[in-house]
Amino acid sequence: MDKETIKAHKISDEEYTQILEILGREPNLLELGVISAMWSEHCSYKSSKKYLNGFPTKAPWVIQGPGENAGVIDIGQGMAAVFKVESHNHPSFIEPFAGAATGVGGILRDVFTMGARVVAGLNSLKFGNIHNEKCSKHQKYLVKGVVNGISHYGNCMGVPTIGGECAFDECFNGNILVNAFALGVCKSEDIFYAKAEGVGNPVIYVGSKTGRDGLGGAVMASDSFNEESKSLRPTVQIGDPFSEKLLMEACLELFKTDYIVGIQDMGAAGLTSSSFEMAGRSGSGMKLYLDKTPIRESGMTPYELMLSESQERMLICAKKGYEDKVIEIFKKWDLDAVVIGEVTNTGKMELFWHDELVGLIPIEPLSEKAPILSRPISEPKYLSEIKDYKFELKLSIQELFIQMLQNENINNKAFIYDQFDSSVQTNTIKADGRLGASAIRIKENGASVAMAIECNSRLNYVNPKIGAALAVASAGRKVACTGAKPLAISDCLNYGNPQNPEVMWQFAQGCEGIKEACKELNTPVVSGNVSLYNETEGVSIYPSPTIVSVGVLEDANKTLKASFEKENLSVYLLGESLGEFGGSMVMKIQDKKVSGSLKELDYKAEIALWDLLYKANQNSLLECANSVGIGGIAMTLAKMFAISSVGANLTSGFDDEKMIFDESASRAIVGLSKENEEAFLNLAKEFGVKAYKLGVSTSQKHFKLDSIELSKAELDKLYFESFKEQIQ
């Protein structure tokens, strides 16, 4: 095998030596391509696995943790929630519409593969500077393309997109982030797993035909960008949501039978990863007859068939003798269904082309025992340069308030979420635009499932460990503010180039933060994804661990809003304000800096707040609640009253006026009627949570907070209309 071919497959000299040892000979091109894909960062997690192994993954309510297509938790009365968040960053930067659309398609398949009907989607989007003349036009093109791709796929599938977050920063100029989350629901006893066992059991290919789109996608997503990346468009998959809708319905029909042993979606690395993962998990072997693969392009080679990432395809291990029944279901839905292989006990993947053996590869070294790297790490030099920076006011409070509320990181994103169908399936209780976590009703048990997606890249830049822990806490707090109990998380870890020791240190610290927070807050990790090499021309993104917290409220009718719908409601701030300005939005807007330091998270205070919110809501003491986040109580209150029908007369009580922009954790704003104040304050005292009365909601159409005063019309214009103008 010549060195240029090996290099083109991103195989290092050390890895090639391992390949020779595993095979006992030189690989052919097909085998090299298969091994390259399975050992890519995207499929093998070779740089990250050693840090992920310490995550807490168990709890009495966890049915399935990491290692399957998606995580599963018990949501009561025999029902389960199946969910996962995943990235499609590199493809979305190259081809925003197709990249984002197929990102949604992939995460939907991960969930319905487990036997669940998908009932909700979320997304976390990060773009570059939309004001800089050099890149704003391209960034706006990316925003519009990505949003269009997400809405197109989700809407066509009939899956409501009910929430998300969108942020902008210069660090994403060369690498945008597109993280998609999906949640499905099924009976706890009806979960299907990705396994291929039982010698002689048939392996069936179902779904759309295979083309050349997406070739090398897993390898492409395991490398950084440079000027040559513009030629990578052919590696972006092309999605067809209508085919996926048929595939989902066919699979859900199949799941009502007892015809199959296991099922796996064909995602990154296509037929390669699905076959190796199914056999690897089961400790079995497999024969694949590649010439039987349904194709839509002529002249496709075994190499292309194994590595194509054409969308809307699944691999099924059926029970012997039930092949025709399985095929009949998929034919009914006008989908291809062909037996292309069988399970063996050899522990090897045997690839045939017109009855000729063209590839023979041991499965375990590519799946369960793929190489794990221990890359060098070192603390970034910039941390010592930024840690002592202190924020001081230079602008007036009113001026800062206005600048912040109309900033693209805070203002309303109706331009984005209005393109998503949030009410299809008629389960949505709380959707995008209503602040905080989103929530859906589970008709089978009357419960509400709340979910929130969170990632503050600036905080992770300032302190990767505490920043990651804060993401776990913040996502959980948003869920708690709906009245639900946070139960588990899914994570999508977006970082720069792992070959840079400073980036690897950031990643290791981020994992420590997640591990610590999940353990202390009792919200285990049940699924996730790692996206590395988010780097262009040597510049990495800020560390960006995206966390989705999922929780359950037993009675969906008790789901809390984040808006004040009545006048004369008492407005309270819960939790302590500690003067946290490191990595804050107010610093970024006033000083154009991301600097400072972060305080350690007080987990006892966080848990106490969650417990108080749950109990107060159970006792029907609260009218509304919202987590305090970016921009401090000033922005939290401004947004709550912007989406409300009433005005506000509020006084913070802070001696230092800048404290209204403090971003301390473990805080929430709640609204309650005056007759419930005494009972609520007694409960807060019982849980050890400080409660500060800020004022009341009023019938007058104005917003007043300390020296800040705006008419309701001015407030609404700043919040609701700014982004539409910025994105045009």
Curated annotation (Swiss-Prot):
Residues binding Mg(2+) 1, per UniProt: E86, N529
Active-site residues are H42, H88 (proton acceptor)
Q: Which GO terms describe its biological process?
A: 'de novo' IMP biosynthetic process
Note the Pfam families from the entry. AIRS (PF00586), AIRS_C (PF02769), FGAR-AT_linker (PF18072)
Q: Which GO terms describe its cellular component?
A: cytoplasm
- InterPro entries per the record? PRibForGlyAmidine_synth_PurL, PurL_linker, PurM-like_C_dom, PurM-like_C_sf, PurM-like_N, PurM-like_N_sf
Q: Where does substrate bind?
A: S87, H88, N89, H90, R109, Q237, E309, S310, Q311, S531
* Pathway recorded for this protein: Purine metabolism; IMP biosynthesis via de novo pathway; 5-amino-1-(5-phospho-D-ribosyl)imidazole from N(2)-formyl-N(1)-(5-phospho-D-ribosyl)glycinamide: step 1/2
Residues bound to Mg(2+) 2 are D110, D265
**Which cysteine residues pair off into disulfide bonds?**
none
* Positions of ATP binding: Y45, K84, D491, G528
Q: Which UniProt keywords apply?
A: ATP-binding, Cytoplasm, Ligase, Magnesium, Metal-binding, Nucleotide-binding, Purine biosynthesis
**Which reactions is this enzyme annotated as catalysing?**
N(2)-formyl-N(1)-(5-phospho-beta-D-ribosyl)glycinamide + L-glutamine + ATP + H2O = 2-formamido-N(1)-(5-O-phospho-beta-D-ribosyl)acetamidine + L-glutamate + ADP + phosphate + H(+)
E.C. numbers: 6.3.5.3
- Subcellular location(s) of the protein: Cytoplasm
- A molecular function (GO) term: ATP binding
Q: What is known about its subunit structure?
A: Monomer. Part of the FGAM synthase complex composed of 1 PurL, 1 PurQ and 2 PurS subunits.
Q: Which family does it belong to?
A: Belongs to the FGAMS family.
Task: Tell me, in a sentence or two, what this protein's role is.
Answer: Part of the phosphoribosylformylglycinamidine synthase complex involved in the purines biosynthetic pathway. Catalyzes the ATP-dependent conversion of formylglycinamide ribonucleotide (FGAR) and glutamine to yield formylglycinamidine ribonucleotide (FGAM) and glutamate. The FGAM synthase complex is composed of three subunits. PurQ produces an ammonia molecule by converting glutamine to glutamate. PurL transfers the ammonia molecule to FGAR to form FGAM in an ATP-dependent manner.
Per its record, how is this protein called by name?
Phosphoribosylformylglycinamidine synthase subunit PurL
- Protein's organism: Campylobacter jejuni (strain RM1221)
Q: Which gene encodes it?
A: purL
